[in-house]
């Protein structure tokens, strides 16, 4: 009976360790993608252009193509 109790405790510790490591990996991925998004947003803000917002001239669009709204990918 003692061996079974020890085995169950070891299994519980291993499972909680695995869950903790998996959670840390997910947080690291979220941080990585957040940093990428923020750096892309800051690039657009620094260049003063918009991806798909309203515009009056081509220079307001990152794509350089304005037709009342920025046309992305042209």
UniProtKB/Swiss-Prot annotation:
Pfam families in the cross-refs: Conotoxin (PF02950)
Record's subcellular location: Secreted
Keywords, ordered alphabetically: Cleavage on pair of basic residues, Disulfide bond, Ion channel impairing toxin, Knottin, Secreted, Signal, Toxin
Keyword Membrane tagged: no
Record-stated family: Belongs to the conotoxin O2 superfamily.
Function as written in the Swiss-Prot or TrEMBL entry: Inhibits voltage-gated ion channels.
Name of the featured protein: Conotoxin Vc6.8
